[in-house]
Structure formats: C-alpha cells, structure tokens
Amino acid sequence: MARNINPKCRQCRREGEKLFLKGDKCFSDKCPIERRNYPPGQHGQRKTRLSDYAVQLREKQKIRRIYGLLENQFRNVYKRADRQKGITGENLLKLLESRLDNVAYNMGFGASRAEARQIIRHDCILLNGKKANIPSQLIGPGDQIEVAEHAKSYLRIKSSIELAKRRSIPSWLEVDFDNLKGLYKNKPDRSDLSSTINESLVVELYSK
C-alpha cells in the first residue's frame, strides 16, 4: 500500500505549523519548526503570495497529513461527509476524528497517529472486547477501546501513556490510564476540534 514517506518534520515545516506527527519530539524544544518555521528547500524563506486555489490545496494537504490519509482515502471520507445531513466540512472532521486510529491516539495508546495505526495492525487494540485491526474503522458513542492484555507491557505503549498524561484528553473521550481502556462518549462538536483547521477551504476545493 502506498504511503507518505516524506520526513515528518519537513511536512510540518511545509504547512507552517506543528502537525504532531512525531509524538514526544513535537512537545519538546527539539522540534525543528521551533527553529526553522519556514518551508523546507533552497527557497523556503522566500515569501510568495498564494492563489485562492493554492490556499485551498494547502489546507487539504495539511488535514491529510494530520490524519495520515492518502488522497483517495481522504476523498472517500469527503464523499461520505457530503452525503450526510448537516454541514459537509464539519461532517468531514467528525468522520476523521471517529476513525479508530485517531481515537486510539487521542486516548494515549499511541504517541502519534502513525504509531496508533501500527499498534492496531499488530492486534494490540480491542474494540468492545473484540480484536480490531482496521485503523480506518469508524466508531461511535458508547464504543469501548482498550489495549490488549498481551500488549500492556510494551514499552512503546507505556511511553505513549506517559506522554498522553502531559497533554489534555478530548472532552468527548474518557480514559482509564490504570487499566488502559477508554470510552468514546459522544461525537465531538465543531467547537471541540482544532481551530487551526479551516475545513471550508476543502469544501470549496472539492466543489469546483
């Protein structure tokens, strides 16, 4: 399966903000964007005025990178959001937030979304008591996620939990760090999600 192999720190610099792709490093002063907050490359510091299309495209790329989706995957999520009732852009973000890999990350079971995807594929996560190994699986209110018994001693998961304790857990989730399990209480409201994302630009881009 195709995947984005570009260095994660370069991806953050390309978007001009932290996308939190590298776990603990993103919360330290070792994060390159703290020292070089401009696009990578020979002409990275040169300021250019972007067209409306370029602004829309950059926003789409930023969201894709945050959630770790390829173009076809992202477009399929958008199509699903567009078919739902309500505001398409908000539907899009709620679907992305409801992916199993994203929820596992937000609960602290992975230091990054990429790591959460990996532990899911390695059968380290249970959904409602049953093995779940599809990172893109959508979950809903009342669903319970927990670390499988055999994986609770893994150093990477223990490290992820310690990192999660230093950052806030989203209000729509409930986490029991002692037993490594969590509850998806309800779907998030738009006000609960990142204010640095402008999903309306993605809607404008795909509406052309």
Swiss-Prot record:
**Its Gene Ontology biological processes?**
ribosomal small subunit biogenesis; translation
Q: Where is the S4 RNA-binding domain?
A: 98-160
Q: One GO MF term, please? A: structural constituent of ribosome
Q: Which GO terms describe its cellular component?
A: small ribosomal subunit
Under CDD domains, the record lists: S4 (cd00165)
Q: Which SMART domains match?
A: Ribosomal_S4, S4
Q: Which InterPro entries does the entry mention?
A: Ribosomal_uS4 (IPR022801), Ribosomal_uS4_bac-type (IPR005709), Ribosomal_uS4_N (IPR001912), S4_RNA-bd (IPR002942), S4_RNA-bd_sf (IPR036986)
Q: Keyword set for this entry? A: Ribonucleoprotein, Ribosomal protein, RNA-binding, rRNA-binding
Subunit text: Part of the 30S ribosomal subunit. Contacts protein S5. The interaction surface between S4 and S5 is involved in control of translational fidelity.
Q: Which family does it belong to?
A: Belongs to the universal ribosomal protein uS4 family.
Q: What does this protein do?
A: One of the primary rRNA binding proteins, it binds directly to 16S rRNA where it nucleates assembly of the body of the 30S subunit. With S5 and S12 plays an important role in translational accuracy.
Q: What is this protein called?
A: Small ribosomal subunit protein uS4
Its source organism is: Nitrosomonas eutropha (strain DSM 101675 / C91 / Nm57)
- Gene this protein is translated from: rpsD
